[in-house]
């Protein structure tokens, strides 16, 4: 009877060990396998052919699902690790895009949408790619397709990775009005306890349709803000911070007519795992299983003593 109990407990322990390993197992990415990206530009069943599309490669992807900024983007003070929300993805997209535009970086690939408003990029290596926004002008107004970041292949915990991806960027329609619009630039600091590390000023380039049209200094005396008035003609405005202070990362976002530049102290930035060295869960699972079995054995032993 005693041997039977121990055999049963041992079998249960093995089952418990195997189940968590399946749940937490990392599905490796075949970084040598070619990827493709098809992008569709359409709105309310209306296709937009003849649109010039640029593709930037911003980060390398590794077999364990981590990535690292590379190429022209390698030195950008932008954190792409630990992103968990759509808001954070939009922040990373707009910030990387502002650097690409301000520095006039050369796209990795370029092309034009076909009659169906689609474009296909083939034979891409695994990595993170940036597609800038597209402004399509029409007789009934402007159609603005949002910029986006895409990881090829997208992360998958279970099953096969998807190496051929189709994306349809979000689009909004607007009618330019001949009126003056005020834009405001605001600098925000997320560095509690490190306020003394802030510089006296920061330099910001302001871009109109990808071209730098003014450079502005933001200081404490100006409350880290700047505003300008322009005629609303549907132009795309962007901002990019130059000479980001050491120890900080930056995000550039826009809400309505307000541009927000946020400097975050790097001490709180999530670092990626070492390449080829993904997080390992099985030692913790093994400890929990052994502890559970030990408690079961202890309970059985105590009941036998009582009897």
Regions picked out by a protein language model, each given a short descriptive name:
Residues 2-307:
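Solvent-exposed loop/turn and edge beta-strand elements of beta-rich ligand-binding domains
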């Amino acid at each position: 009877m005693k041997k039977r109990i121990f055999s049963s407990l041992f079998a249960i322990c093995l089952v418990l060990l195997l189940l968590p390993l399946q749940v937490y197992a990392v599905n490796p990415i075949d970084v040598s396998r070619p990827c493709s990206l098809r992008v569709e530009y359409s709105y309310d069943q209306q296709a937009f052919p003849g649109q010039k599309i640029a593709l930037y490669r911003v980060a390398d992807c590794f077999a364990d699902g981590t990535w690292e900024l590379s190429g022209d983007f390698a030195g950008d003070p932008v954190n792409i690790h630990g992103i968990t929300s759509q808001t954070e993805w939009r922040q990373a997209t707009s910030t990387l895009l502002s650097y690409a535009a301000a520095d006039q970086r050369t796209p990795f690939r370029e092309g034009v949408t076909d009659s169906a408003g689609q474009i296909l990029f083939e034979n891409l290596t695994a990595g993170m790619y940036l597609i800038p926004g597209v402004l399509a002008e029409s007789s009934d107004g402007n159609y603005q397709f949002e910029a986006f970041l895409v990881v090829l292949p997208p992360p998958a915990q279970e099953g096969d990775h998807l190496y051929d991806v189709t994306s349809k960027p979000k689009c909004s329609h607007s009618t330019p009005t001949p009126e003056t619009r005020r834009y405001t630039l605001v600098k925000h600091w997320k560095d509690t306890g490190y306020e003394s590390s802030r510089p006296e000023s920061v330099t910001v380039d302001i871009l109109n349709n990808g071209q730098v049209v003014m450079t502005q200094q933001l200081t404490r005396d100006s409350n880290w803000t700047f505003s300008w008035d322009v005629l609303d003609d549907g132009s795309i405005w962007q901002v990019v911070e130059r000479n980001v202070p050491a120890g900080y990362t930056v995000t550039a976002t826009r809400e309505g007519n307000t541009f927000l530049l946020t400097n975050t102290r790097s001490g709180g930035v999530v670092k990626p795992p070492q390449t080829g060295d993904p997080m390992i869960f099985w030692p913790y699972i093994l400890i929990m299983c052994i502890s559970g079995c030990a408690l079961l054995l202890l309970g059985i032993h105590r009941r036998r003593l009582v009897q």
